[in-house]
Amino acid sequence: LTSEAPASPGLRRIIVQPVLNVEDVKAVENGLSEQGVSISELMRRAGGAAAEEVMRLEDVHAVAILVGFGNNGGDGWVASQVLQSHGYSVTVVSPVEPEEIKSDLARLVAKSAEDAGVEIVVGPPREDLMEILSSSDLVLDAMLGTGFHGEPKPPFDIWIDTVNAAGVPVVSIDVPSGLSAQTGHAPGACIVADETVTMLCLKPGLISDEGRDVTGGIIVAPLAEQTERTVLDNDPTAWRVEPADYADVVAPHTNNVDKYSRGSVLVVAGSSRYPGAAVMAAKAAARAGAGYVTLAVPVTIAPLIQMQLPEVPVVGVAAEQDGTFSAAARPVILKLAERSSATLVGPGMRVTGGTVAVVSALINSKAPLVVDADGLNCLARLTNGHLDEFPEVTRRDAPLVLTPHCRELGRLVGLADTPPDSLTAALEAARRIVWADGGSELCVVAKGTATACVGVEAALLPEPGTASLATAGSGDVLGGIICALLARMPDDIEDLPLIAAFGCEVHAVAGSRAAKRYGSRGVMAGDIADEVGLAVDELEDHVSSLVAGAAEDQEPSL
């Protein structure tokens, strides 16, 4: 779909937005109503915003609008009348006659559209529906709205499958029908949209899990001047980060540097079973810009690791017979951490008495620390799977970044058997940890299809990566990137979630670059690590250009 006109105030063509839970969106609607923008007026504006987006698209003359029983369908009825008044050929497909619609508001606007002469087809069989769709230039989906969850029931399941099979471009109103706007799950039939015009603000399900595959381009329609303030008053559950927000964490380009001023990183990782994890993490830290990387590994694998990383000093420390860290390694590791700007612990360590002792020692140190992979599993063992009930473990005088995927996160908060299965659930679990701690020195990076960087004050959602990141060792690369960024930050930096989010975006860009070389299914962790340096440059250049452009826009004209 291509658009031919600039956006009006009713449509905001940006991705970066506060994200509200569905129940809080209802509170925003009620708040706007109290400020004089009634629910019926919001429906009128929502339908108008959807119609406005359709009218921006090129080569669209005939529009099929599929409506449901509720207010989402009401938006579609409003859009039908607006489009017809602008000369479009419009056909509304409804499950019932207008007078049989249960929602009072939707019934009123449906009757209005009927009185205006909009063509209405009620409950067509699949063959007739396919004929309507095939003769249309675009489908406007207004069947199931933000209150939907579960699997679509007839006739909507059949209609959804028919729309997807028709091959006609689709614009969804608020949310693609069949998708949960809260969880991002779509267990049954679900519209695959080319664009989604969502009202008031983003919802978690639009940007996570199946939502990423079915929403297409997302356009937010604020609908009212008061919306921004009202959304903020309802405490967004998360925030999508825009590139310009990274200006404070982008390192200025200067030749007045040395290897230590770029930050020194210690990586404590590896075992005889997983030596590659240490290699991936250390290489990623170096590629991400750390000037000096030291790798501490069990002495039994040190020669093997050193052959893989000739540029990185490899320190072999005390090991058990099974090739894992011994508790006796703690003094050496703590001394190395004391000399480093930041430390990463966990990749490939395994979970043993010795590794638990090493992780515990580092947690109790004053080293800025990133804990990943088995380091997190060691933390789970230290706290009996309830890190949120042991805030003294994470309450320290130095930055601490935890980078769990959903299963690791579940093990940390007593949900090992039922790990978080959505962005919403991951946010809730991560907040149990950071709110128990209560300090600004802790950030939980809840990795998933939509990764959340959760601090005590806010949860940030970086631009997500592609499926190329779903490969063994990819998380080790991310841990190295975040540790390198942490190492070069000033001591007084307070926004750990923003640093972590930038690291996630570097990781995503590196994965995309690797996919161009090896294919989306052929990428290995080492390929991602090799692209990290160029990914950092690409993102930093983009951020710098945005900041420079914004500065030029603010300069007074002569």
Please name every model-derived segment:
Residues 137-138, 143-236:
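Internal gly/pro-rich beta-alpha loop/helix module
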Residues 104, 151-152, 184-185, 414-417:
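Short, solvent-exposed loop/turn segments at secondary-structure boundaries
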Residues 125-128, 177-181, 204-205, 375-378:
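Short acidic loop-to-helix transition motifs that present clustered carboxylates
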Residues 116-121, 147-151, 319-324, 347-350:
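Short, flexible loop segments at the rims of nucleotide/cofactor-binding pockets, characterized by
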Residues 52-143, 149-173, 357-360, 365:
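Nucleotide and nucleotide-moiety/phosphate-recognizing core
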Residues 2-95, 102, 195, 206-373, ...:
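Small-residue (G/A/S/T)-rich helix-start motifs and N-terminal tracts that mark the onset
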